[in-house]
Amino acid sequence: HAGSDHLSNFPTQSTSQQPTYTQAVPTPIVIRALIITSDASIIIGKQGRHINEIREMSSARLNISESIPTNPERILTVSGALDAVSKAFGLIVRRITDEPFDEPSLPGSRAVTIRLIIPNSRMGSVIGKQGTKIKEIQEASGARLNAGETMLPGSTERILSITGVADAVHIA
């Protein structure tokens, strides 16, 4: 019925006396990353096969900006529920490193750096007081995080680099 996929904590029509509640939809998040054009080509794949596979497996929405001849980088936008976005980034690293999607990262797995674009106003909550939050994320994930000191030219955003194997990037 209409509206069932929207945030709702209201009783729905039911034949029983007890009100029933529909599942609340998680708030979608949007994360953007700078990627080099060669990685963008790998992520997209022939006729979009790779990007469609990542979309299906993660349930996240993925979009890659058009290539600009003077710029070696493109913007990857990943949106959806937090777990879908996290999974998508893990799958993206696996695609770049040419590792199978269904196996855990191995000690010999290649580490990749994902460069997230974070609003300067949000960077404090990522880093935490005296770097506590960023250290927690690093310890929990095994990835290395590095917050850019300066804002990107002509913007109010900074780069947060995450370096690690696919599983570490997924967790971070």
At which residue positions do the language-model features occur?
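Low-complexity, intrinsically disordered regulatory regions of RNA-binding proteins
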Residues: 1-42, 50-121, 139-144, 148-172
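Long, charge-patterned amphipathic alpha-helical coiled-coil/hairpin "stalk" segments used as oligomerization
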Residues: 126, 130-136, 141, 148
